[in-house]
Structure formats: C-alpha cells, structure tokens
Amino acid sequence: VTLGRVQVTDFRSLHSAILQLDPVFTLITGPNASGKTSVLESIYLLGRGRSFRTRRLDHLIRHGAERFVVFGEVDAGGRRIPVGVEGSADGIRAKIAGERPASLAELAIALPVQIIDPEIHRLIEEGPSQRRRFLDWGVFHVEQSFVSDWQRYQQVLRQRNAALKARQPRSVVSVWDADLIQYGLRLTEARSRYVELLVAAAAPIAQHLLGLSLELGYRAGWSKDRALPEALDLSWSHDQEAGATQVGPHRAELAIRLEGSPVKDRISRGQQKLLAASLLIGQVKLFPEAGVQPTLLLDDPAAELDDQRLAGLIGEVANQTVQLIVTTLHGEFAAFGNPGRRFVLEQGELQAL
C-alpha cells in the first residue's frame, strides 16, 4: 500500500496544495512555520481520521474557510483507491472508494500511517492511554480481527459504565459482565502476543540508539493474582463509588524498562525521544511480516538530536520497508538516498522541485 496523489484544501495555513508522492521517499523542505508539519498532519488524518497535534477540529480549518478537505489516492496492489476526509463544524466525514466507512478503523486498513515527530516523547512521558492507543493500532494491523473485539468491548464498557453512573443495582450492572469478560480477555490475549513481537523488534533498535537493553511487559488492567471474573467481582464497591468500571483492559499499561528499571521520570527528554522512536520503528518493522507496507512520516528529525543520535535514528528508519515522507529545514539525508520527489514549502505555497 502506498499513497500517490494528495490534494489538501483549506487545511490550517494551506489554501490549496497538491503532491504526487514517491512510493519510496519524498522530501519536503522549507523554513520554520511554513506549513511542513501541516502537510504531514493532513496525510496522517487520511489514515487515522484524527490529528496528531490537536483534538480541536476548528484549529484544522483555515481561517475564513468553512471546512477542510484532504483527498488521496492509495495504490493497493495495482488498484487505485480514493480516500477522502472532510472536517467542518459538523465533525469529520470520511469516504473510501466513494463510500462512507462504517468506522474510522477502515481508514487505517486503507492507509496505515505512523509518524515520528519532535513530540514523540509523549508516548513515554504521558499516561497509559497514550501507550494503549499505540499498542492497539499495532495489534490491529497484525491481527485485523482485533478491531471488532475492541469495538465490542468499548460498547459493552460504555453500557456498563452508564448503568454504574445511573446508580443501577448490581443485578442490572452485571448483565454486561459476561461480554465484558469475553471481549476483555480477547483484547488481553491479542495485546500480550503483540508485546512479545514488539519487544523482539524494538529491543535491537533501542540498543543501537540508546546503548541500553529494552524490556516490555503487559499489565492487563487487573491484579495478576486474579482472573478477570474474580477481579471484576471484587471491584464492585470501587465501581459503585467511581461510577465507572475500575478493572479491565481499558486500564491496561505497557510497562517499559531500560536496563531492568522502569523508565518513568528516570531518563532525559532526549532519551525519551529515542526510546519512543525505537518503539515506533519496531512497530513499523512488524508490518511487512503481516503483508502490509505502511507510510512513515518523519517530521523534522534533526530537532533536539545531536549529530550522532540523528545519524542513528536515520539509519534505523532507512532500514525499514516503508513509504517515507520526510520534512526538514534544508538539505537531504544520505542514508535515505536521493528523494524520488522533492517539494519546497514557503508561506503556505508548495512547489515541486
């Protein structure tokens, strides 16, 4: 799967931009605040249905416009599949091959896209939900049945939480327990399998970039000394008090250790970035084994990295089987080879070179 033509209209500072992307390597250069990150953000939106920078939809619409439109043509085994996303005051609307998808997960099937940007340290620094989202996106592409189990679990969880919030008796709340347990265990098993694959892929990268041994573990979201049915039963009083379900895979955590010690608050910002990059590149590394070629967006890789660390990061990215789209202030990166397509962006105007 590769992304070919992309057309962006009224997205952030971009009034109108058209890119014909190279299937291997596209380079976008330009000064700071020229809109380079916005181009990557629009491509990310095509594959995710959301921004990696903001939850505020109105921030994505160019000042004075009523909506933005991002359109792309995906080449999937010789078939061209049009994919489009439109955002307005009414929300996000997507189309794949002219049809409205049943869920935004279908965008991820049509265009698997991941990003490494200057904010990737948030994957390490912020709370467990960031890491659950990272895990689930990876599991979905390795085990595509995962998304239906995830959606069903979320539906059951919402219904159970609504009953708890409404102070319904235990006999009413427990109606949802069997499905919560069934789908919760499926998610847990799939995530656990994926973490084993991920650490095998990411540990050598972390060793190269950080010079430290990486270990990953999966904490299921309830005590490891109990089965989920027992944990759910014992949590009843806590659930009542909180008005929400307190155990289950929605409370899971990806445990990360370097040299045997938890990483939280123990490593520098630069190390956080390289650790997060190791996980993201490790995730991308697993895609070809599942028969998928992802699009990898690399935004300003030189930001806050010294020459040695930058060379290591670029070398690891260059080893992956991806469609690569890179933004930078100027220049090229020899490890990637010559870009098949190159664009320069200045003051919101994009030109092919």
What name fits each language-model region?
Residues 1-31, 45, 170-182, 186-295, ...:
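Conserved NTPase motor "head" modules and their coupling/switch loops across ABC/AAA+ ATPases, GTPases
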Residues 122-123, 129-174, 178:
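Long, charged N-terminal accessory/stalk domains
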Residues 299-301:
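Walker B catalytic acidic pair
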Residues 36:
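Conserved lysine of the Walker
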Residues 18, 93, 113, 295-296:
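Hydrophobic "anchor" residues on beta-strands that sit immediately upstream
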Residues 44-130, 136-146, 196-204, 214, ...:
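Nucleotide-state sensing region of NTPase/ATPase domains
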